[in-house]
């Protein structure tokens, strides 16, 4: 009998959370080559991240309420099947427009993963148990940003960009199998509620005046805004400003991913000892320091290693803050965890898309757009924490 505990269960939650990271991080080294393959400018590669994020946001608005009505597993299976189909369309198309449409659908379907991973964690009872489950799953999720760019770089050398989308098809199949084997239904029928516009409106109004939810969501939104600028334009910046070939960006990005995993590990290990609020404070201070550093670098022409030091510090803070701020925001949600997770995820992904498009729009062939977007995000995280620290 499947039980909501154990390493396999946590690993599967991590895989669900990783549907976003796997789908976007694997694209990072390939964005400039894909753009060139379709005769597009390098900055157009950011649209692949942006369209996924927009679709992802709309998906989050759907999967949470559906899971509150029908349980966690039926929407999960349906969306995972759609995710696999969209990946196959992207792999087979010869049209950049169809590719972007496929990325939108892939994002829409992929929204089920983080939404239901968070809702399933909240079903465990809330409080420290939810925070620990999300933090542990986030550590597992960290494998995706470490290995996905390395896999993409290898596929670019051994084959071409289409192999990247076939890899996502295989990942989707693995997620479905893992859910079937290890994840039980955590929302029993007696606790399910039929979604309605009126009910969702009432729930949303309650959440919009709940400070803990608002500050937790704002922190998640802001930390993703800066991170998605890195995903959207990191490869283009290093190739254009520093001459780094796309196939070498995967190993460089893996350094960031290790920093993310270390940040998530620190949050998971230290939150129980020092308290969630203390670790969020440390993450906000780290993010603020990286933001000031990156904004200062925008005024000079730093070596790549100096620029990447600021980026790595930000990503470490990203790993530290993400799961704990999400858990803090969901803690007051109670029985409407699915709707709360959808609202949080929708806000997060729309800001994610905005971060990618902002970095692309500001791109002038130098490092400055990356520094501006990530730097402002880091400083804003510190400001948000200072204003809402009693709730975080």
Residue ranges and their predicted role:
Residues 82, 86-89, 97-106, 305-313:
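Paired small-residue
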Residues 278-324:
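C-terminal transmembrane helical hairpin of 12-TM major facilitator-type secondary transporters
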Residues 39, 71, 92-98, 109, ...:
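Helix-breaking motifs and short loop linkers at transmembrane-helix boundaries and internal kinks
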